[in-house]
């Protein structure tokens, strides 16, 4: 039977009816009987978690399908119906085979350098092999490649760029030639000029974005996925390394202290800011609502955060919003989430690929 829903649609704020035919939306009533699944509320495209790691957990790798499914279900329960996996050491493509799980856009494995990232998490190559590995991971992912662009340099005792700028530029150019976009892990300031000059597509974390760097990024189309709820771990990371690497520890504390101001300044400069949790490392999955609250707490207007977490974020990742013929992926809330963050905790209905899943 054809499913029917009525409510106020965002972002256009129009109250109207929609029907689901073949997993897609239509605003023209079809022939035959219909089943109304909701008759009021605020209807928005499913939320996005634009930085998570399906197949990773605080306890370690999750290679089994059941464990990965459980992680994806946590995201779905929070309203995240589109996940961008920002690198995973295990094969998580099984999640893509389940119609009841969020859509998953994969970035293959992280590309890192030996001794310059979390051990065993990424594919480790030297600079001479970076471009070739980008080719491999572009083929292994779904239009995204993930590069670790800075990490602690133990000899220097502080964060430092991982790749020479010319090599990084060649790697990003090769990804673009292959039709892939590049996301870069970067905490500090020093790796950012090379990334920006290379045409990086997505800055992950971005705590090193100074005012001058923000001015350079603005207008380029480069996005930032700040993962604020993971940045909240910086003080504990600093404490763990303080005895051996005091300069690094002080740097991490300073980055944490300015993180909210810097992301707000980036937003005010017009840089797109998208929601991502970094789930799978030190954080569990299903925390997109916490990240939304953190971004609002940083001073970004709530309506803008919801837009970037929903219809604008989906568009950035290549999916349509609530328009004729679009995939029927939406969440219905009792109140307007641009006004009430609390309503995100209790969705009335969740529809994924045209089926009611919650």
Predicted regions and their residues:
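Acidic/histidine-rich helix-loop elements
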Residues: 54-65, 114-125, 155-161, 236, ...
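N-terminal metal-binding scaffold of metallo-dependent hydrolase/deaminase domains
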Residues: 1-33, 43, 331, 335-341, ...
